[in-house]
Swiss-Prot record:
Homodimer. This is Phosphomethylpyrimidine synthase. GO terms for cellular component: cytosol. Substrate binds at N239, M268, Y297, H333, S353, R354, G355, D394, G395, L396, R397, E433, Y460. NCBIfam families: PRK09284.1, PRK13352.1, thiC. The gene is thiC. Pfam families: ThiC-associated, ThiC_Rad_SAM. [4Fe-4S] cluster binds at C581, C584, C589. Catalyzes the synthesis of the hydroxymethylpyrimidine phosphate (HMP-P) moiety of thiamine from aminoimidazole ribotide (AIR) in a radical S-adenosyl-L-methionine (SAM)-dependent reaction. Binds 1 [4Fe-4S] cluster per subunit. The cluster is coordinated with 3 cysteines and an exchangeable S-adenosyl-L-methionine. The keyword Membrane does not apply. Its EC number is 4.1.99.17. The lineage of its organism: Bacteria, Pseudomonadati, Pseudomonadota, Gammaproteobacteria, Enterobacterales. It is an enzyme of class 4 (lyase). HAMAP family: ThiC.
Length: 631
């Protein structure tokens, strides 16, 4: 925690400097590699961690070394992780998927925006200073066409996006030759299908079955294809966004870039303050990962924050606005039904979802059914025209462990299952949002209920938090639950930062939340037995046993913190080659002792072997050459 708190002006200036001087940056001793596919333009980025060799013998003057293989890892940082790419936030990222979208021939450019709100914003000269300069000309599906990845998958089409994902999910593990690195414990997958090698056909089949989604709006061509499904790597989402109280456009762009650097697979823009439209445009044009939103937040801003004044027309206009900007998935709270609201009256903490409480208030004030539920088919028609995935929101999720797994929570979940089938009628991709606050012994039921009632659509949960006693540490309390539910089959985990329940997260909070959740996701992949998940762990363990300190730092999820902690007590360069750390010192290091025991045992084996040979030699009479019949 910083010693001095920056003023708002200083925070904005710092963020502006960050994005003005932004360059592609690699992690220490890592380099960007690309693996190409068969489709034109399929060039999948990964980070390769370079390792130092292992000392295996020789003399001080002529040591002998054995090379250690470089470790390829999944990389969400996009162009920001490649030092060879020139970054210009004012211009945005290259449109990676544009040629693929155009080649399909099923979209058309819009000469006029569909949203009245967008038209008004574009006509307002007073916003010119805030506006992203290179506004994208939006596309939509041609009349009678659907442009979703689910639509293509159901027709047996393997898209470039699917091939890109197959290569990405394999994480370059085919490059690893060492048996030590390839060793992996069997997992317990709870019914997940985890093939040894992920093919583009497997990706297509999972999407076609609705078990996985590829969030990829045709108006967000800058994004690198990724997949969310329980038969793939567990993903992590980071939330950013301004509020009426704090944050600015430059700070949100900074948080976006920061999030992708630290492993966010998707980012949700939850802005509720001024200039939501303009902020989102900057984020989308500079995001290599899918962007999600909760459209009801902006719709509420359009009616001056009065939930009772919300209308379907205002909400529909917001969907069109965001779809044409390029939002990849919408959280829609269509399962908060009028008859479910009284079920929350017995709760300790009531309705804690912002979207859920907005819709509950609207339903009660009008005594009408949720207009998102009533107009759900129209929502699906919009999504099908732009390939916006639906994240069906858990507006009645528990906000305390006392309220976990109650009647209201599961009633809504069952409704989300009904809505999933409707969305699939329109070839719209769907995932299901989940809790919340759930003690450990009650977590697995959430997964089994979701699989059964939501037809194996991907599950996307906030945590869950396993205890309510640790404000300031809720990234820990929720990371425990996230690891568990990820193991049970949850496809994506929404991070929680140390500021949860306390305030809007800053850059450092975003990093802490992401590191915690990358640990949880990776632990879940290990427990499930995801092929190749253990390679990095094995490389780290080998480096640790061999006292290759630099490699230990570089293999870490956060190399900078690992190095800083080591250097607090052993800052000298000699500490980077020492066969001990400050925890135990040179005399009591268990790994150093283990090495000595191993070397001693090997020497003893040789000595015993030599003694046996000597005894055998004497027993045969001490002759140098044996007679032929004795040999």
């Amino acid at each position: 925690m910083s010693a001095t708190k920056l003023t708002r002006r200083e925070q904005r200036a710092q963020a502006q400097h960050f994005i003005d001087t932004l360059e592609g940056t690699a992690f220490p001793n890592s380099k960007r590699i690309y693996i190409t596919g068969t489709h034109p333009g399929v060039r999948v980025p990964m980070r390769e961690i370079q390792l130092s060799p292992t000392l295996i013998g020789g003399s001080k003057e002529q040591p002998q070394y054995e090379e250690n293989e470089a470790i390829p890892v999944y990389d969400t940082s996009g162009p920001y992780g490649d030092p060879q790419i020139a970054i210009n936030v004012q211009q945005g990222l290259a449109k990676l998927r544009q040629p693929w979208i155009d080649a399909r021939g099923d979209t058309e450019e819009l000469t006029v925006r569909s949203s009245d709100y967008t038209k008004a914003r574009l006509a307002d000269d007073g916003l010119d200073e805030l506006r992203f300069s290179g506004v994208l000309t939006p596309k939509r599906a041609k009349a009678g066409r659907r442009v979703t990845q689910l639509h293509y998958a159901r027709r047996g089409i393997i898209t470039p996006e699917m091939e890109f994902i197959a290569i990405r999910e394999n994480m370059g593990r085919e490059r690893i030759r060492s048996e030590v690195l390839r060793h992996q414990h069997p997992g317990m997958s709870f019914g997940a299908r985890l093939p040894e090698n992920i093919t583009a056909e497997f990706v297509r089949d999972e999407v076609a079955a609705g078990r996985a989604i590829i969030p990829a709006n045709i108006n967000h061509p800058e994004s690198e294809p990724m997949i969310i499904g329980r038969n793939f790597l567990v993903k992590v989402n980071a939330n950013i966004g301004n509020s009426a109280v704090t944050s600015s456009i430059e700070e949100e762009v900074e948080k976006l870039v920061w999030s992708t650097r630290w492993g966010a697979d998707t980012v949700m823009d939850l802005s509720t303050g001024r200039y939501i439209h303009e902020t989102r445009e900057w984020i989308l044009r500079n995001s290599p990962v899918p962007i999600g939103t909760v459209p009801i937040y902006q719709a509420l801003e359009k009616v001056n924050g009065i939930a009772e004044d919300l209308t379907w027309e205002a909400f529909r206009d917001t969907l069109l606005e965001q779809a044409e900007q390029g939002v990849d998935y919408f959280t829609i709270h269509a399962g908060v039904l009028l008859r479910y609201v009284p079920m929350t009256a017995k709760r300790l903490t009531g309705i804690v979802s912002r979207g859920g409480s907005i819709m509950a208030k609207w339903c009660l004030s009008h005594h009408q059914e949720n207009f998102l539920y009533q107009h759900f088919r129209e929502i699906c028609e919009i999504c099908a025209a732009y390939d916006v995935s639906l994240s069906l929101g858990d507006g009645l999720r528990p906000g305390s462990i006392q309220d976990a797994n109650d009647e209201a929570q599961f009633a809504e979940l069952h409704t989300l299952g009904e809505l999933t089938k409707i969305a699939w009628e329109y070839d719209v991709q769907v995932m299901i949002e989940g809790p919340g606050h759930v003690p450990m012994q009650m977590i697995r039921r959430n997964m089994t209920e979701e699989l059964e009632h939501c037809h194996e659509a991907p599950f996307y949960t906030l945590g869950p938090l396993t205890t309510d006693i640790a404000p300031g540490y809720d990234h820990f309390t929720s990371g425990i639950g996230a690891a568990m539910i990820g193991w049970f089959g949850c496809a994506m985990l929404c991070y929680v930062t140390p500021k949860e329940h306390l305030g809007l997260p800053n850059k450092e909070d975003v990093k802490q939340g992401l590191i915690t959740y990358k640990i949880a996701a990776h632990a879940a992949d290990l427990a499930k037995g995801h092929p190749g998940a253990q390679i990095r762990d094995n490389a780290m363990s080998k480096a640790r046993f061999e006292f290759r300190w630099e490699d230990q730092f570089n293999l870490a999820l956060d190399p900078f913190t690992a190095r800083a902690y080591h250097d607090e007590t052993l800052p000298q360069e000699s500490g980077k080659v020492a066969h001990f750390c400050s925890m135990c010192g040179p005399k009591f290091c268990s790994m150093k002792i283990s090495q000595e025991v191993r070397d001693y045992a090997a020497a003893q084996t040789i000595e015993v072997g030599m003694a046996d040979m000597s005894e055998n030699f004497r027993a045969r009479g001490g002759e140098i050459y044996l007679r032929k019949e004795e040999a």
